[in-house]
Amino acid sequence: MSRLTSTFQVLRHANRKALIPFITAGDPEPGFTVPVMHAMVEAGADVIELGVPFSDPMADGPVIQKASERALVHHMSLGKTLDLVAEFRRADRTTPIVLMGYLNPVECMGYQRFVDRAKDAGVDGVLTVDMPPEEAGEFVPMLHRAGLDPIFLLAPNSSDARVQRMAALGRGYLYYVSLKGVTGASHLDLAEVESRIAHIRSLTDLPIGVGFGVKNAETAAAIGRFADAVVVGSALVEKIAAAQDRPEQARKDIVDLLAVMRRALDA
């Protein structure tokens, strides 16, 4: 059983919802990442999504695009991101780590080499934003054989057939994109999202996480009433951007926001 599956089972039995923060590896500089990952776990994170910096992050809004830019100034790469995961794993063997990024760096490294390195580093899941299930035929079986969970993005307009295909290929959880557009967008219609999640549940038994547009504890708590996990990204990355020259302040601001969200989810 994967760490992700085990984590969601434990949470389900405890009637709790997963809190999944996202940060970009190496933002604002590489030495910040691992300490803040540990701090996020202490603040109540159940899973961590770690973004792989990329020069053309088309699915990301301005906040996370700038995070990639800050990380790339320090020559961050997929390989260096995996090194950070391995460093995190030296002290934390239980918190699942999901790499979130684009296909190009994986293709440049080579599918098999990436899978081998990700497994060795202690990665648990791989979410490749621009790899639709129709094009995942070679990559996904490699992930399965290595015990890595492929995670797919569900859009509000995904057809039933597409949801079922992603559920058949995916492991760990499905990531429902609560808004049409890029990360960090606003105007979240919670009633519409809740209705959509209820329908998706009729098509798959995989846990469902909801992200894009989660800005505060109130929204996190509302999503937690019908989803299995709440993913928060841009709101945390904004804290890093606002205090990028003051790492201790950035870490405190991230921890404070996550702690409030954790309390709201558990209330």
Swiss-Prot record:
One of its GO terms (molecular function) is tryptophan synthase activity. The active site is at residues 49, 60. Keywords: Amino-acid biosynthesis, Aromatic amino acid biosynthesis, Lyase, Tryptophan biosynthesis. It holds the Pfam family Trp_syntA. Its EC number is 4.2.1.20. It catalyses: (1S,2R)-1-C-(indol-3-yl)glycerol 3-phosphate + L-serine = D-glyceraldehyde 3-phosphate + L-tryptophan + H2O. GO terms for cellular component: cytosol. Pathway: Amino-acid biosynthesis; L-tryptophan biosynthesis; L-tryptophan from chorismate: step 5/5. Belongs to the TrpA family. The lineage of its organism: Bacteria, Pseudomonadati, Pseudomonadota, Gammaproteobacteria, Methylococcales. This is Tryptophan synthase alpha chain. InterPro entries: Aldolase_TIM, RibuloseP-bd_barrel, Trp_synthase_alpha_AS, Trp_synthase_suA. It comes from Methylococcus capsulatus (strain ATCC 33009 / NCIMB 11132 / Bath). Tetramer of two alpha and two beta chains. The alpha subunit is responsible for the aldol cleavage of indoleglycerol phosphate to indole and glyceraldehyde 3-phosphate.
